[in-house]
Amino acid sequence: MIYQGETLSVRYLDDGIAELNLNAPGAVNKFDLKTLECLNEALNALYQQSDLKGLLITSDKDAFIVGADITEFLGLFAKPAEELSQWLTRANDIFNKLEDLPVPTLSAINGHALGGGCECVLATDFRLADITARIGLPETRLGIMPGFGGTVRLPRLLGADSAMEIITAGKDKKAQDALKLGLVDAVVAPTALKDAALSMIKDAIAGKLDWQKRRAQKKAPLTLNKIEATMSFTMAKAMVAQVAGKHYPAPMTAVIAIEAAARMSRDEALVVENKHFITLAKTDVAQSLVGIFLNDQYIKGKAKKAAKEGQPTKKGVVLGAGIMGGGIAYQSALKGVPVLMKDIAVPSLDLGMAEAAKLLNKQLERGRIDGVKMAKVLSGITPSLHYAGAEDADIVVEAVVENPKIKAAVLAEVESNVSDTTVIASNTSTIPINLLAQSLKRPENFCGMHFFNPVHRMPLVEIIRGEHTSEETISRVVAYAAKMGKSPIVVNDCPGFFVNRVLFPYFAGFSLLLRDGADFTQVDKVMEKQFGWPMGPAYLLDVVGIDTAHHAQAVMAEGFPDRMGKNYKDAVDVMFEQQRFGQKNGNGFFAYSVDRRGKPKKNVDPAVAELLAPVLGAATDFTSDEIIARMMIPMINEVVRCLEECIIATPAEADMALVYGLGFPPFRGGVFRYIDTLGLAEYVAMADKFAHLGAVYEVPTGLREKAAKGESYYTQQVNA
């Protein structure tokens, strides 16, 4: 044994060939601070070996290295820039030490080699992958860029264009694609990886493979003439500007760093990478995107825990076919849980099966599934007019029409047709779970399961706990939602649950702006282009459906009359009266036509201004900051109230529900990350300026107290 550390070891195999084996405690290998130090110590030991002829790097895990330990990021990013620079320099000194070993080096890659894992294999002379390998640099998706030499070595290995595509997209490459690009030298079967790696390193030792030429290429400037460089970097910047936009600076910064270092040697180029990495690490965007990653891991961790605690779902029932029921049935069957889809009408069952078939055909066309998988999924959905077969179901998801009396009747009926241990969940967006539970004999087996439309695309599922819901029920439904590929977030029962409860104060802010003379097209433009929502409020209302929103607003007003009741007629009322229901019937705040791909196309409708004139104030030119403040303060206040009232358990879950359920701009991180970034005292001062507008603008007491104490909602990281 040459070296034995906590996360890796080095030993001789035969004839002067050493193996550096990555085998950290836990499920995966990460390039955390500890592993970097172990690598440094291992390399120091290797430099002392006079008999060393070659080095293989291997992994004992299913994945080579999944990347850096992102839980360390926020702590590192909070350090002074000089200290962060020193850490990066030290890390790169270690990778340079690997690259500069006086013998040929080879990485034998199995599974994922991402981020720091990819940068590690780039530092070796050769890369051999098995067919399961996926290699990439996802850092730009976290608001940063590669910092362990990725922007230096990858362009010198692949050429600037291919390297910039990989780095700016942040997506990994399958083994065969990596081979075509030249990112790996060969791809073999998993069982052949070790022997093939030994054979290749022996060829390098024997001089059959020129490892020194390979190494020299990675340490030299890029081989681009001035005209080629100008064309390459100009096109890359134009593409990145179009795709990433102004709110996500990391991809553009990576391109700028590669361009600035193009004519430099490795060591000079690493200094450039260091500087640009630090610039990004200090941005609010990086804090937000890293925070989202950590929050997502926290939610996944809770779902895994629930899966261990609750019995697995082997069979489900969906009550109510149609688009929503068909979508739920499809998602369940796709992920391996067969379902009985029950309805009272054959046309509805046909519609549900057609919805599932349509979604599967899209997957087939895109090459994501084959015909065998499609047939298997469809055979996993059994349409039925009867309850026969439901008696052994683990979970029932009721998805009938959004009417409390109908739902209550259906729930009582299904309860009498299933076992005493079957969990029943209602897919409802507005009806209180405690109200529906009154129709059941076993309310402890009942909860809400609010899917978002379209089911196959929207990641969030709200799991609603009623007064009598057992923890066993919650665990089983959370585990089922996770099995379906969703992000389940548990909330307590209240009008609108969490997502709709916080959405309608936002719509109230919109109505008040219009009442005070704002132009709804300007409001939409500001909230999309400046704040970063995928849709402005008018467009969102059209997509949700004006009739749906009008009904939900009445429910919210009944539940929270002080804040959400209104004593004036607003723009949504006018749209509803005029039966302009939005995209569903072609007219709402905007008019809709069908584009060449069959998708709704939004158009300005001149008739709307005249229709709204009676409820609009005198035209007023609001600044972008005023529009953002007046739109966001009501939502922020309601989100905080939900936390204070224990409707939602943590800031992390609240922020992820907003990002996954409403499309809250990821670069802002969610409401709690956003107000932490603003500063709670600054937020309170801003909100107080608008307090005269009504109760939705009044800052919750708990938030005001935290602001006075100088506190924030997040510490540096969320622990799963």
UniProtKB/Swiss-Prot annotation:
Keyword Isomerase: yes
Segments of this protein annotated with the region 3-hydroxyacyl-CoA dehydrogenase: 311-720
Known EC number: 4.2.1.17, 5.1.2.3, 5.3.3.8, 1.1.1.35
Keywords assigned: Fatty acid metabolism, Isomerase, Lipid degradation, Lipid metabolism, Lyase, Multifunctional enzyme, NAD, Oxidoreductase
GO cellular component, one term: fatty acid beta-oxidation multienzyme complex
GO molecular function, one term: 3-hydroxybutyryl-CoA epimerase activity
Subunit structure: Heterotetramer of two alpha chains (FadB) and two beta chains (FadA).
Family: In the N-terminal section; belongs to the enoyl-CoA hydratase/isomerase family. In the C-terminal section; belongs to the 3-hydroxyacyl-CoA dehydrogenase family.
NCBIfam families attached to this UniProt entry: FadB, PRK11730.1
Annotated protein name in UniProt: Fatty acid oxidation complex subunit alpha
Organism for this UniProt entry: Photobacterium profundum (strain SS9)
Gene that this polypeptide is encoded by: fadB
